[in-house]
Curated annotation (Swiss-Prot):
Pfam families, sorted: Methyltrans_SAM, RlmL_1st, THUMP, UPF0020
Subcellular location(s) per record: Cytoplasm
UniProt keyword Ubl conjugation, yes or no: no
Keywords assigned by UniProt, alphabetized: Cytoplasm, Methyltransferase, RNA-binding, rRNA processing, S-adenosyl-L-methionine, Transferase
Annotated source species: Shewanella sp. (strain MR-4)
SMART domains xref list: THUMP
The name this protein goes by in its record: Ribosomal RNA large subunit methyltransferase K/L
Highest taxon of the lineage: Bacteria
Length: 713
């Protein structure tokens, strides 16, 4: 009997142990990401050829305590390596694990390599050569908790590589993961009609067909690790291989299970057909190009096993939620009597099915943790003759309070916005506390920003509520799901405003009181335009005619554009970010504004103010400043707190202000308190103008910002 370890992805251990038991292996013991077992050589060959779940089979040569480099060397040296491979063979060592005396895996691999070549030399043979790539013999060593395991890779390249895949589609499913889905769903134990409406490159269906047709998954592999092993029994291996070929030929002819696969992408369907042809099972599978929502259930009952899309891409969440909701509705109404098994990495998406799972399991698709849920669709939920739900499905049972509120808001604001001459505005701002989001309309696009929930609310609850919001939105306000962008907003921490979110760009041009601005709905946390400052920007424009205007912490320069369009004599735009200054220049160009009177300055605004305050010639007639509530950017020398530092800030700004000049000072600190007493002593006059600067779409949230008009006393 020989000792082996079958490696597999995390979560496969139970299924793999069951498979090894069915093969007839003994002394089976589950471990992390694999299973130990013993088997005679012939059975080990059979397991290597027939396992559908293992990623790798290794022959365990030595396992024992190891507490020093000397013990590691001795453990490897005591093995009779010449009985395993010839010195004419090349070898390599994969070492895993650190701790104690092993600081890095390279050290461990080097010790074992030295022991192997020394043993060959001491036995009177020339040393074998090490090959980093494509070695004849691959040694696997694992060090964990003071125990060293030295093994030989028996199976060769990863066993999930069956040999039938020509190329991969986007986000391919590994073959042994597909096989485990078939095992854990219960389908393998009783093969019956199988449907995959998101078949992609066909992996689930091909693996199922291989099972039903009694085809060994390793039959098309061109290479195995034991081929250069000195104890390899070629005759026994040939016999097992020929038996598998005969079973495959007979199995395809006898297979009466029906397989159906479809995908909306014709290129993937063509690829699935090629893969099935390579695997020898194309004649068993009916592939077609189709939208999953239009796929009819085959006659009778069966299994629907699939790995639907669960994009990690920002902005696709709402569209996917709609898809999952409509799938759940379709399953309930058209697939009565069927069993459904679905792999998905996103709990929000799979919960949007609105189906109660019989069983929930955890699987890993590579490093991605996924839920694998099983559902039984009761027979009384029979097929209906009405068409499938359209994209803007009425889902009044989902978040009705939110849906009714935003529908009402949208109706009121649409006419107002048209009259105002704006096409970007806020529709909803956590009006109902349970639905803690802000919803903004930018032309025909919607941006949903999730506020951070209190720690007292369970994460599962907040996720479900957000999911319901995204499901309800399209029908409530008549927007296409793919035009909904999702963002998560937290309490501002220093440089959050400047953090890039996504390489993709969804850019639009919005109009505001005649001014045009570029928006980027996906690139950053903010879109390029603070909607709550709309009236403040217009006020700046109205006050700018013939004046020298300074815009500090300018962001994308929207207030500067209003000033220029308002007839400013000059406009100086200052911001720390080159990215946003470039954006500001684009906004000027959009409005056909150019000339030397428009200056753009990249600088730490606080330091720029300090330096300019010393320059008696630097005078401005109108200053607009909207500083961050708090900032500790690496590019700014000091931290800034608007409550703590506003007196000092305004004291410096007043030195830049002409005798009849005005400062429009705004910030977003909700409990901001202006120190009017100290400022009065400094001969600075302060007037709150919140009533003039709060737009109608923000009346529900009057504390969104506070704005002040400041002059010389």
């Amino acid at each position: 009997m020989l000792n082996f370890f079958a490696a597999a992805p995390k979560g496969f251990e139970y299924s793999l142990a069951q498979e090894l038991t069915e093969f007839g292996a003994t002394e089976i013991k589950e471990s992390v990401a694999g299973v130990y077992f013993t088997a005679p050589l012939a059975l080990a060959y059979r397991i290597t050829l027939w396992t559908r779940l293992a990623s790798r089979i290794v022959l365990v040569i030595y396992k024992g305590p190891c507490e020093s480099a000397e013990q590691l060397y001795n453990a490897a040296y005591c093995i009779d390596w010449s009985s395993h491979f010839s010195n004419r063979n090349t070898f390599s060592i994969d070492f895993h694990g650190t701790g104690g005396f092993i600081n890095n895996t390279q050290f461990g691999a080097l010790k074992i390599k030295d022991a192997i070549v020394d043993r060959f030399r001491d036995d009177g043979d020339a040393r074998p050569n090490v090959a980093r790539i494509d070695a004849d013999i691959k040694i696997d060593a694992h060090f964990r908790n003071g125990v060293i395991t030295i093994a030989m890779n028996f199976s060769g390249p990863s066993l999930h590589q069956r040999g039938y895949r020509s190329t991969t589609g986007e986000a391919p499913l590994k073959e042994n993961l597909a096989a485990n889905m078939l095992v854990r769903s219960g389908w393998k134990a009783a093969p019956t009609t199988l449907l995959d409406p998101f078949c992609g490159s066909g992996t689930v269906l091909i693996e199922a067909a291989l099972m039903a047709a009694d085809i060994a998954p390793g039959l098309q592999r061109s290479r195995f690790g034991f081929e250069h092993w000195r104890r390899h029994d070629k005759a026994t291996w040939h016999e097992i291989l020929e038996e598998a070929k005969a079973r495959a030929s007979l199995g395809v002819k006898r297979c009466d299970v029906k397989f159906y696969g479809s995908d909306i992408d014709s290129r993937l369907v063509a690829l699935a057909k090629r893969n099935a042809q390579n695997a020898g099972v194309l004649e068993l599978i009916d592939f077609k190009v189709a939208n999953a929502l239009n796929v009819e259930p085959p006659a009778g009952e069966g299994y629907l096993i699939t790995n639907p899309p669960y994009g990690e891409r920002l902005g696709s969440v709402s569209e996917l939620l709609q898809l999952y909701y409509q799938l759940g509705d379709k399953f309930k109404k058209e697939f009565g009597g069927w069993k459904v098994a679905m792999l998905c990495s996103d709990i929000e998406l799979i919960s949007a099915l609105k189906l109660k799972a019989d069983k929930q399991m955890k699987m890993f698709n590579g490093a991605l943790e996924c839920a694998f849920n099983l559902y039984t669709l009761h027979a009384q939920s029979t097929r209906r003759d009405t068409p499938v739900l359209p994209e803007g499905v009425d889902i009044a049972d989902i978040a009705p309070a939110f849906a009714n509120r935003i529908k009402k808001n949208a109706k009121q604001l649409e006419k107002w916005a048209k009259k105002e001459g704006i096409d970007s505005y806020r529709l909803y701002d956590a009006d109902i506390p349970e639905y803690n989001v802000a919803v903004d309309r930018y032309l025909d696009h919607i941006v949903v920003q999730e506020y951070m929930a209190p720690a007292s609310i369970p994460e599962a609850v907040t996720k479900r509520r957000l999911s319901d919001v995204l499901l309800a939105l399209p029908a409530a306000i008549g927007v296409d799901p793919h035009k909904i962008t999702m963002k998560t907003r937290e309490r501002q921490k220093g440089t959050n405003q400047y953090q890039k979110l996504d390489e993709r760009k969804l850019e639009l041009i919005t109009t505001e009181y005649g001014a045009k601005f570029k928006l980027n709905l996906t690139g950053y946390l903010d879109t390029g335009l603070f909607l709550d400052h709309r009236l403040t920007r217009r006020l700046v424009g109205q006050k700018s005619k013939g004046r020298r205007v300074l815009n500090l912490f300018s962001y994308t320069g929207s207030a500067s554009v209003h000033a220029a369009l308002g007839g400013a004599k000059s406009v100086t735009t200052v911001d720390m970010s080159n990215t946003y200054l470039a954006w500001a220049k684009e906004n000027f160009a959009l409005n056909d504004l150019s000339g030397k009177q428009y200056e753009f300055v990249q600088a730490d605004c606080l330091q720029w103010i300090r330096d300019s305050a010393l320059d008696k010639s630097a005078q401005y007639d109108l200053i607009f400043i909207d500083p961050p509530t708090f900032s500790n950017s690496k590019r700014m020398e000091d931290s800034f707190d608007v409550q703590r530092d506003h007196v000092n800030l305004l004291g410096m700004l007043i030195k830049l202000l002409s005798p009849n000049g005005e400062i429009v000072f705004s910030n977003n600190k909700r409990k901001f308190k202006m120190d009017t007493e100290t400022l009065a002593k400094m001969k600075i006059k302060v007037e709150n103008i919140d009533d003039l600067t709060l737009p109608m779409d923000y009346k529900r949230n009057p504390h969104i910002h506070n704005t002040w008009l400041i002059t010389h006393a």
